[in-house]
Amino acid sequence: MAFATRQLVRSLSSSSTAAASAKKILVKHVTVIGGGLMGAGIAQVAAATGHTVVLVDQTEDILAKSKKGIEESLRKVAKKKFAENPKAGDEFVEKTLSSISTSTDAASVVHSTDLVVEAIVENLKVKSELFKRLDKFAAEHTIFASNTSSLQITSLANATTRQDRFAGLHFFNPVPLMKLVEVVKTPMTSQKTLESLVDFSKTLGKHPVSCKDTPGFIVNRLLVPYLIEAVRLYERGDASKEDIDTAMKLGAGYPMGPFELLDYVGLDTTKFIIDGWHEMDSQNPLFQPSPAMNKLVAENKFGKKTGEGFYKYK
């Protein structure tokens, strides 16, 4: 009798999970974990397009800083969007801000959300532990998504019991301005989950593209090897960094040269990505670390944010 009861419970649980994954979700309520630049940007665009948002971080001070940054960003948007009607711009800012609440307790706010978007530190263990904990409190239908740019989505999904309702949702910086969103599907991501995230991205005014869970997805898989190859040209003495930048801007039509872009993104960020890929596939020639970049990072010369990278900034 006890065995039969356990089997029935398992069957009902399995049926419930299958039903949740088979159903397309209209995302109205969004929980964003991480109040940094990316998380705040995601919260801003979600709230500005009619979604109810809860922004979560570790302390009230961080959240206050995040909301202040969101307000400043919104006022810039309003100034341009409502140039002829400042009053309407003020109303837009206030309405958007009123749609964003904050919390320092993620577990207490995910029970009724439709979508959880994680945008915290790029650390597999930290992210996995977060998702494992939230999985116990989130509703059955809730979709989990990570904004990671370098970690494997499948590894994060495996920390939960909702692998079919788990995907990558990779925004680009600055989120309010950049139109692209990469929707990353693992082998377990259901078609309905994928469709739900594509639809959600469109409601944000973004252009979603879908891809498999491979290193770098689409943009970084093409961009990072290009940047590293530019550094190798420089390391070999084939050309100066200034001439390489000029060549790519004037010859390829790129708005920034590779060294300018590396300094803008952050050499520490690029090193983190390439090191992670190298760890996954050390034989891939595209994933080989750069001695010149490693040296700069070791000297805490990360680019524009530290005042010096490949170039010096005043």
From Swiss-Prot:
Q: Where is the signal peptide?
A: none
Catalytic reactions on record: a (3S)-3-hydroxyacyl-CoA + NAD(+) = a 3-oxoacyl-CoA + NADH + H(+); (3S)-3-hydroxybutanoyl-CoA + NAD(+) = acetoacetyl-CoA + NADH + H(+); (3S)-hydroxydecanoyl-CoA + NAD(+) = 3-oxodecanoyl-CoA + NADH + H(+); (3S)-hydroxyhexadecanoyl-CoA + NAD(+) = 3-oxohexadecanoyl-CoA + NADH + H(+)
Q: Where is the transit peptide?
A: 1-12
Q: What Gene Ontology cellular component terms go with this record?
A: mitochondrial matrix; mitochondrion; nucleoplasm
Kindly state a single biological-process term from the GO annotations of this entry.
Answer: positive regulation of cold-induced thermogenesis
Q: Name one Pfam family in it.
A: 3HCDH_N
| Compartment(s) of residence | Mitochondrion matrix
Q: Keywords in UniProt for this one?
A: Acetylation, Differentiation, Fatty acid metabolism, Hydroxylation, Lipid metabolism, Mitochondrion, NAD, Oxidoreductase, Spermatogenesis, Transit peptide
| Record-linked Gene3D superfamilies | N-(1-d-carboxylethyl)-l-norvaline Dehydrogenase, domain 2, NAD(P)-binding Rossmann-like Domain
Q: Where exactly is the site Important for catalytic activity?
A: H170
N6-acetyllysine PTM positions? K81, K87, K125, K136, K179, K185, K192, K202, K212, K241, K312
**Record PTM:** Succinylation at Lys-81, adjacent to a coenzyme A binding site. Desuccinylated by SIRT5.
Q: By its UniProt entry, which SUPFAM superfamilies does this protein fall under?
A: 6-phosphogluconate dehydrogenase C-terminal domain-like, NAD(P)-binding Rossmann-fold domains
Which residues are recorded as modified (N6-(2-hydroxyisobutyryl)lysine)?
K127
The reply on keyword Nucleotide-binding is no
Record-listed N6-succinyllysine modification sites = K80, K81, K87, K136, K185, K192, K202, K206, K212, K241, K312
Residues the entry annotates as binding CoA: S73, K80, S149
Documented EC number(s): 1.1.1.35
What this chain does, per the entry, is described as: Mitochondrial fatty acid beta-oxidation enzyme that catalyzes the third step of the beta-oxidation cycle for medium and short-chain 3-hydroxy fatty acyl-CoAs (C4 to C10). Plays a role in the control of insulin secretion by inhibiting the activation of glutamate dehydrogenase 1 (GLUD1), an enzyme that has an important role in regulating amino acid-induced insulin secretion. Plays a role in the maintenance of normal spermatogenesis through the reduction of fatty acid accumulation in the testes.
What is the annotated quaternary arrangement, including any partners?
A: Homodimer. Interacts with GLUD1; this interaction inhibits the activation of glutamate dehydrogenase 1 (GLUD1).
Note the PANTHER family from the entry. Answer: HYDROXYACYL-COENZYME A DEHYDROGENASE, MITOCHONDRIAL, PTHR43561
Name the family.
Belongs to the 3-hydroxyacyl-CoA dehydrogenase family.
Please identify the protein, giving its name as recorded.
Answer: Hydroxyacyl-coenzyme A dehydrogenase, mitochondrial
Q: Which organism is it from?
A: Sus scrofa
Gene behind this protein: HADH
